[in-house]
Amino acid sequence: MTHSEPHPATLPPLDEPTRCLVRLAAVIGAGTERQVRAFLLEARALPPDWVEEVILQSYLFAGFPRTLNAAREWRRLSGAAAPGADPDADATVMAEEWRARGQVTCAHVYGDMYEHLRVNIAKLHPALDHWMITDGYGKVLSRGGLDLVRRELCVVAICALAAQDRQLHSHFHGALNVGATPAMVSGTLDALSDLIDDDSLRRYRLLWGHVRTAHTKLAQGKV
């Protein structure tokens, strides 16, 4: 299975490795350096590719400084050297493929809202539309090493801890669209309960409830 395709929802509500991963994603994006260090220590029990990919994708949501800090700490704590090369990151040969697979992955994530999204982002700036597809969904979120369901759950986690409500709403939908079960999304919020203040967590659970209800009605043909 390529990672531009939905991943079958065969996970339990939130298995312990995935719980560890979403917590790591959240603190890389919006936690303290001490939290990042502590959660990376725990992450040594995870498949290394998962950790590498969560660190790499964090630059889309948290910027290069936090990504570089996490990567540096991961190299130190894991003792694992960086790969000697990464052909999938070479723009001179991959640019066209990034755009093609980015369109596919973004369409999976946004479903029926995909065309509307493209129009709205282009109205903000055409460069943002190009970068969203080519860099965000093509170059980064379509990489191998981590399935799209876990990637989306990690995006939910980072948006929640960073208090990015609008993006959180979008990626609640996105997680369901790519195959996450409602229990997985609920489990992701539960995994952050010691990191997010009670008022915010209550608000996010309410928002998630609205999204879940909307998806249920859509599946039943009631809307």
Predicted ranges, named:
Residues 1-19, 29-50, 59-148, 177, ...:
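Acidic, glycine/proline-rich low-complexity segments that act as flexible tails and inter-domain linkers
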Residues 21-27, 151-159, 188-192:
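Short, structured motif recognition centered on aromatic/hydrophobic residues
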Residues 31, 163-166:
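Alpha-helix capping and inter-helical loop/turn segments
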Residues 39, 165-173, 186:
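Short conserved catalytic/interaction loops centered on acidic-Pro-aromatic/His motifs
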Residues 52-56, 186-190:
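Beta-strand segments within the central parallel beta-sheet cores of soluble alpha/beta enzyme folds
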Residues 157-162, 175:
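Short, glycine/charged-rich beta-strand-loop motifs at protein surfaces that mediate ligand recognition
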Residues 160-164, 194-195:
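Short Gly/Pro-enriched loop/turn and capping motifs at secondary-structure junctions
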Residues 178-183:
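Accessory, usually C-terminal, subdomains that scaffold auxiliary metal cofactors
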